[in-house]
Each structure stands twice: as structure tokens, then as C-alpha cells.
Amino acid sequence: MNNEVFPNKFKAALAAHQVQIGCWSALANPISTEVLGLAGFDWLVLDGEHAPNDVTTLIPQLMALKGSISAPVVRVPTNEPVIIKRMLDIGFYNFLIPFVETKEQAINAVAATRYPPEGIRGVSVSHRANMFGTVPDYFVQSNKNITILVQIESQLGVDNVDAIAATEGVDGIFVGPSDLAAALGHLGNASHPQVQKAIQHIFARAKANGKPSGILAPVEADARRYLEWGATFVAVGSDLGVFRTGTQRLADSFKK
């Protein structure tokens, strides 16, 4: 059995500022996730915040991605150490932490993924991530192979973006466009000039601090604009969105 899980190639690609094109997985189903894994995306977000996912639904999705080139990234429902620990133990190495507004919150997110003395991650000697105790040097290698992406989606987060981006252990800054738009008074309108200006500012400050930036942009024109603005890791759609629009288009083509 191949029990080599390191190094984390997605983390290395981000550190090298290589463009990484991703997709959102929101259907909470191993078959749809497996299909996404066959498409050739660099990374996939398995959403634990707005999709009906938990440990029991995420494990089969991780299994479905075994052998895929797509790096699984879990968006946890909240920045909470026990939740993060459980995601680590089932086999996630890449984390998207929602609603980070301060440097302290970013520090706490990093600490939750690191074993002592660098952090506070609880220790289990046998779990899915270390292939039930068979991965050589897991405890030595784990801390330096975890990816932490923090999500900026409020005015306070925008105000503190430099301090957040400069936090040791933070690998990238991700913009939550819908929540950011709502926070800026433009609910449902991420295209508003004020929101777009804030997004561009976040990208610029991430770059100034040597960190890659990312965003979810299911509209192709938006995704290409964000890439031109310097975003490195961009999710260009979702399984739910593709399924909904594709089936609607198919039905409409025959019913009109």
C-alpha cells in the first residue's frame, strides 16, 4: 500500500504563486465529488459551511477523490478547534476558514491545525489521516504540510487584511464575495463598485504581504477579471450551479 501523503503539492503551488483553478462541491455526494475529481481542477472545496456536510458525508467524498489530481479543501463551518481537529483526523490537509476578521482569529485557526508546541491540535495515534498509524513521520511532517486559507468577508476583515495576511502559518487570503457585499450594504450585488474596489484592495494587500489570494467566481467574466487583478486560486463554479443550469437548459430546450 502506498502510504506517502507528503509533501502537500497544493500548498507548494500556492507558495510558488502558481495559478490554481478550482471548483466548489456543494452537493454533499461522493458520486458528484468523484465526477468533479475527474474534470482536472487543481483544487475542490468540500463545503461544510453552507452545504449539508459533516464528518460522515465528507469521508466518502475524500475516498472518492483518492487518485484525483484535485486537492480537497474543506471549508469548515466555523473557526473552532474541535471541528478543525476532526477534519484533520479524517484526512484533510487544506482548510478554508470562514469569517476571519482579526489577526488573533487567524492565529487561532493556524494553532488549531498544529500539534504542540506550535499549536493545540489534539493527538490521536491512529486515524484516517495517518492511515491508521502507518504513515512514516506523520507527527513530524503534519505541521508543515497543512494549508490555511482565511476568508475575508466583512469590513473589519478588510480593515485588518494586512495583519491577517502577515500571520505566520496563513497560506492565502480568500474573498467571500457574497458576504462581503452584504457587509458593505449591497446584499446580493457583489458586482457593486464598492464591493469590487474592496476585492481588488484585498488582492493587492495579500500580494504586498507575499500571500496568494483567491475567490469564488462562477461567472466566467468575473473569474477572468479576478485573475487579471492577481488572484491566484480561483474557484470558477460549483457542482450545484452546473447541475442546476445544465438541467434547466436541457429542459427548456425541449419544452419551449
UniProtKB/Swiss-Prot annotation:
GO cellular component, one term: cytoplasm
Site (Transition state stabilizer): residue numbering on this chain: 75
EC top class, as a word: lyase
A GO term, aspect molecular function: 2-dehydro-3-deoxyglucarate aldolase activity
Cofactor dependence: Mg(2+)
Binding of Mg(2+), residues: 153, 179
Catalytic activity of the protein: 5-dehydro-4-deoxy-D-glucarate = 2-hydroxy-3-oxopropanoate + pyruvate; 2-dehydro-3-deoxy-D-glucarate = 2-hydroxy-3-oxopropanoate + pyruvate
Keywords assigned by UniProt, alphabetized: Lyase, Magnesium, Metal-binding
Pathway: Carbohydrate acid metabolism; galactarate degradation; D-glycerate from galactarate: step 2/3
Catalytic activity, EC: 4.1.2.20
Cleavable signal peptide: none
Cofactor note: Binds 1 Mg(2+) ion per subunit.
Function field: Catalyzes the reversible retro-aldol cleavage of both 5-keto-4-deoxy-D-glucarate and 2-keto-3-deoxy-D-glucarate to pyruvate and tartronic semialdehyde.
Listed name of the protein: 5-keto-4-deoxy-D-glucarate aldolase
